């Protein structure tokens, strides 16, 4: 019955918003400079462009997506404007990386998660502070905040100097199943977006946080291209399902296994 209801709603929305599809943009605005102290940017020693985001979860650990793994990763913390860096901005490199599966063998619906230990810890400052892991999973219809330095237009790419933030909603997993096809009956992911489109994470936002009611609930994983299409919400790694694994690794149990 749930699937039938979701499909019916999708059909109604598709008819309602078909004429608006050409007007879609990657919605959102510049983040408030004080709202993303936990947001980090990833780049490599070969390129200064931020290619992924990540989330500081304590002074020594950053969480991002497995598909953001690269050689020679650099981690920028305390950033807002790329052109005018904050005085307390810091750069770190990973000392260790931990995966549920290899960064080459994760799937779109499972285990797209990477935990990085910084070579040197960071201190809290005006623009740097960790966010806590979630105590409970988010509920459907929760209002969430997605953020990053990814492109703000699609399919043409326009990369901003400052991170952009947008409010999106947690949706039934069945909505993503209907939208993307090929997804299993269950997965450790969250389906999030705006059904009418216009607001979405996009290229360059991968690995960044999804914050719901003040809690770090998701890691930007993948979605449709062009971004921001109606009826094509994004898919996010569900952080709550991995909290035990994360906490075990941080505690020193490097042989900890992820949930099946």
Curated annotation (Swiss-Prot):
pH-dependence of activity, as noted: Optimum pH is 7.5-8.0.
Q: Which residues form the propeptide?
A: 19-24
Note in the entry = Negative results: has no activity on gamma chain.
Q: Which residues form a coiled coil?
A: none
Top-rank lineage group of the source organism: Eukaryota
The top EC class, named as a word, is hydrolase
Q: Which CDD domains match?
A: Tryp_SPc
Signal peptide region: 1-18
| Described purpose of this protein according to its UniProt entry | Thrombin-like snake venom serine protease. The recombinant form clots fibrinogen by cleaving fibrinogen Aalpha chain (FGA), and slowly Bbeta chain (FGB). Has amidolytic activities.
Query: What is one GO cellular-component annotation here?
Result: extracellular region
Q: What is this protein called?
A: Thrombin-like enzyme gloshedobin
What InterPro entries does the database record attribute to this sequence?
Answer: Peptidase_S1_PA (IPR009003), Peptidase_S1_PA_chymotrypsin (IPR043504), Peptidase_S1A (IPR001314), Trypsin_dom (IPR001254), TRYPSIN_HIS (IPR018114), TRYPSIN_SER (IPR033116)
Q: How is its activity regulated?
A: Completely inhibited by PMSF, and N-tosyl-Lphenylalanine chloromethyl ketone (TPCK) and poorly inhibited by benzamidine and derivates. Not inhibited by EDTA, heparin and hirudin.
Name the protein family.
Belongs to the peptidase S1 family. Snake venom subfamily.
GO BP:
proteolysis
**Disulphide linkage map:** 31-165, 52-68, 100-258, 144-212, 176-191, 202-227
What is the scientific name of the source organism?
Answer: Gloydius shedaoensis (Shedao island pit viper)
What subunit structure does UniProt give? Answer: Monomer.
């Amino acid at each position: 019955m749930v699937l039938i209801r979701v499909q019916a709603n999708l059909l109604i929305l598709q008819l309602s918003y078909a004429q608006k599809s050409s007007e879609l943009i990657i919605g959102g605005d510049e983040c408030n400079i004080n709202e993303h102290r936990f947001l980090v940017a990833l780049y490599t020693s070969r390129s200064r462009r931020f290619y992924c985001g990540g989330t500081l979860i304590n002074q020594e650990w950053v969480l991002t997506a497995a598909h953001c793994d690269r050689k020679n990763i650099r981690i920028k913390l305390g950033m807002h404007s790329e052109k005018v860096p904050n005085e307390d901005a810091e750069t770190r490199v990973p000392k260790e990386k931990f995966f549920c599966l290899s960064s080459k063998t994760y799937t779109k619906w499972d285990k797209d998660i990477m935990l990085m230990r910084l070579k040197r810890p960071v201190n809290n400052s005006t623009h740097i502070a960790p966010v806590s892991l979630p105590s409970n999973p988010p509920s459907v219809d929760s209002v969430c905040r997605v953020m990053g330095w990814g492109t703000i237009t699609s399919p043409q790419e326009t990369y901003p100097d400052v991170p952009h933030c947008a409010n999106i909603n947690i949706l039934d997993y069945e909505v993503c199943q209907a939208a993307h096809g090929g997804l299993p009956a269950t997965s450790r992911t969250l389906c999030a977006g705006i059904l009418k489109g216009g607001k979405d994470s996009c290229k360059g936002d991968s690995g960044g946080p999804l914050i719901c009611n003040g809690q770090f609930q998701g890691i930007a994983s993948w979605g449709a291209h062009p971004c921001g299409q109606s009826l094509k919400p994004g898919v996010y790694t569900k952080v709550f399902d991995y909290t035990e694994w994360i906490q075990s690794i941080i505690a020193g149990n490097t042989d900890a296994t992820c949930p099946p």
